[in-house]
């Protein structure tokens, strides 16, 4: 199983990071709008074992092309950065994938939008993320912690602490702390 290694950093403003990426000659990949549907068993067995099951649709803002994936994430490994085994496959339909998981007795426990701008720098993927209620994050994913740290330093983000909690955990905590029962989190209509 492939290993996902990443550093997630909370930032106030994405503009300085975007500017730094441009100045460093990073490759712009695209702007995307994602919908992430998170599934678990009725008794929350995946969550209890620090595992995840997600169906994601990602729409390219420019071309409107859409990709849908189903992803299983294994438990996080201990270390300075977030790393975990990940298996992902492309599927034809978000609706069909969610229906299939429901037929297999998985329950959708959360759905949230994310705006993502994707870049490549130093052999790493750099994602500039905006999430409703949670704010702005930079995710740097690479083949090794060393490669990620190098990109983090080159973006002047070395002083930012790494957030090891997944977006799912951050969003669930936000909703629970506020007594929110609606688990479908979207950006306000514009």
What residue ranges belong to the model's regions?
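An amphipathic alpha-helical core segment
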Residues: 145-146
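A contiguous pocket-lining binding segment that forms or flanks enzyme active sites
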Residues: 129-134
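N-terminal strand-loop-strand beta-hairpin
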Residues: 1-125, 157-190
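Internal alpha/beta scaffold segment
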Residues: 149-155
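Extracellular structured ligand-interaction cores
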Residues: 137
């Amino acid at each position: 199983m492939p290993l996902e290694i990443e550093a997630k950093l909370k930032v106030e403003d994405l503009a300085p990071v975007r500017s730094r990426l441009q100045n460093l000659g990073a490759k712009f990949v695209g702007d995307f709008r994602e919908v992430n549907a998170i599934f678990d068993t009725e008794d929350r067995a995946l969550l209890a074992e620090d595992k995840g099951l997600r169906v994601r649709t990602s729409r390219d803002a420019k071309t409107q092309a859409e990709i849908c994936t189903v992803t299983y994430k294994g438990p996080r490994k201990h270390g300075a950065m977030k790393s975990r085994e990940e298996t992902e496959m492309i599927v034809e339909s978000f609706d069909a994938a969610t229906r299939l998981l429901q037929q297999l007795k998985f329950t959708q426990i959360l759905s949230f939008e994310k705006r993502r701008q994707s870049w490549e720098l130093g052999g790493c993927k750099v994602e500039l993320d905006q999430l409703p209620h949670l704010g702005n994050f930079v995710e740097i994913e690479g083949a090794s912690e060393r490669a990620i740290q190098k990109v983090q330093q080159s973006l002047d983000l070395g002083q930012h602490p790494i957030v090891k909690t997944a977006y799912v955990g951050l969003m669930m905590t936000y909703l629970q702390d506020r007594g929110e029962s609606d688990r479908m989190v979207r950006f306000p209509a514009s």
